[in-house]
Amino acid sequence: MCNILGIFVFMEEEKVVLVDLKDQQLGTMGKMEAHEKAILHRAFSVFILNSKKELLLQQRAFGKYHSPGLWTNTCCSHQREGETNLEAGHRRMMEEMGISVPLRELFTFIYEASFDNGLTEHELDHVMVGYSDEDPKINTDEVESFKWMSLDVLKKDLVKNPNDYTVWFAIIFDRFYQHVNNKL
């Protein structure tokens, strides 16, 4: 429920797509309920690289319900029912970062991470990559700040300052780094 100018508006809760270990859809559930019950659901993570082989990082907004203020990959979220992974990636890149670039899927993986607020991420994550030299036009409801960082410097900083980054980013990065370095 949201109070807009004294009028209460009931907003439909965002739903996530529940999946099995093979990414077959099992149904949908409210996002908060899925995170409270640690139910496996579909998600995605986008990585945008520039021509200098730097990764576009976002600092999550301080108002986020988990991992506020932490640095992470360019964009991450959940697919909607009936939406392809690439459609979801494009939608959220525009909503969060104001960028539209071609994306391609690199790999998927499953992870589970609990947070100190009682919520748990249990996601089958589709990792995508795109390329752009454009600075984002961030949505400050979602993103506090952004920066470009070389992959090698980032790899060292994740070891030196792990608490500055989201749990899932630390899990994904090594695999992303290996995949990208084999292709660059």
Predicted stretch roles:
Residues 33-44, 51-91, 95:
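Conserved Nudix-box catalytic region and its N-terminal flanking loop in Nudix hydrolases
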Residues 99-108:
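A short coil-to-beta-strand element that immediately follows conserved catalytic motifs
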Residues 46, 75, 105, 126-128:
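A structural signal for short, well-ordered beta-strand segments
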Residues 11-45, 51:
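Acidic, metal-coordinating catalytic segment for phosphate/diphosphate chemistry
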Residues 10, 32, 69, 110-112, ...:
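Nudix hydrolase/Nudix homology domain
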